Amino acid sequence: MSSYRLGYCMKEERHNLVLCLWSQSPGILNSKCLWPFTNIHLLVGALPREGAGGAWGGGRSEQLPTCSTTHHDFTWDKKVVNPLFEKRPKNFGIGQDIQPKRDLTRFVKWPRYIRLQRQRAILYKRLKVPPAINQFTQVLDRQTATQLLKLAHKYRPETKQEKKQRLLARAEKKAAGKGDVPTKRPPVLRAGVNTVTTLVENKKAQLVVIAHDVDPIELVVFLPALCRKMGVPYCILKGKARLCRLVHRKTCTTVAFTQVNSEDKGALAKLVEAIRTNYNDRYDEIRRHWGGNVLGPKSVARIAKLEKAKAKELATKLG
């Protein structure tokens, strides 16, 4: 099989520049480095393999051919076009060719729940949101939230299956004649607005955790003020789904710690201290901050255009 010596020249019309690159490998034809270049003239010559002393035998190196840089030394082959193939340019006007694929996300008719949550998010930005509702945007930081959920995971209430197994084991023990000794109820999380409200009013809750995305928000809008009045530390956690997983429910708005084991009292005290600093002690500051009142890009552009016209008119009057 004969080896190929490949040389290709690229000429730039304006600067009369010729780039010459020589290679002994035919694989250079498929090299991606050639793709960006246009007007490349390929010169491929089949040269017979030389002996042991030739250019490929490791002996003396043969002088490679050179490519002249003058304009008239080589000719450029014109692209051969078959006249039988006619050009049929597409017309994307109305009622003409099929339109190309475009991103039509803006025109999709989304499901009702998606439209509602998007409209709600826009309204919360456009309208002036009172402080009582705006306070639910100030959620617990990620590090403290992780520690809180880690502690709360230890005090998850039992599931239906666990309760069934516990009662079954107790019934079997009683049937065997070993006696029925009532056990003390372990400390667990208490969930639900009514339950937590009662615990706060009786000052039995040690820490109250409220979800930030309760819908309707009126269900829990009074809880921060009640907790502050009764001196109970409270915090606002991002995502009611995280609370739902803790207490094995489909929906959950708030949970409360009532009791913890002796080994976890130190961790709970640290959490309560950090949460009290961020929420209870800052209540007067939080209730003064309104939210929303952020205009959209169209309104901002319209106002800027009017201001520019007013400034131009004033400059004309002042002369």
Curated annotation (Swiss-Prot):
Gene Ontology cellular component list: cytoplasm; ribonucleoprotein complex; ribosome
Top-level division of the source organism's lineage: Eukaryota
Molecular-function GO terms, alphabetical: RNA binding
Residue positions where N6-acetyllysine is found in the record: K87, K150, K270
Main location: cytoplasm
Covalent link Glycyl lysine isopeptide (Lys-Gly) (interchain with G-Cter in SUMO2), residues: K101, K150, K178, K298
A Pfam short name: Ribosomal_L7Ae
Keyword annotations: Acetylation, Cytoplasm, Isopeptide bond, Ribonucleoprotein, Ribosomal protein, Ubl conjugation
4Fe-4S is among the record's keywords: no
Subcellular location: Cytoplasm
SUPFAM superfamilies linked: L30e-like
Quaternary structure note: Component of the large ribosomal subunit. Interacts with CRY1. Interacts with DICER1, AGO2, TARBP2, MOV10 and EIF6; they form a large RNA-induced silencing complex (RISC).
Similarity comment: Belongs to the eukaryotic ribosomal protein eL8 family.
Reported function: Component of the large ribosomal subunit. The ribosome is a large ribonucleoprotein complex responsible for the synthesis of proteins in the cell.
Name of this chain's protein: Large ribosomal subunit protein eL8
Organism: Oryctolagus cuniculus (Rabbit)
Gene name as annotated: RPL7A
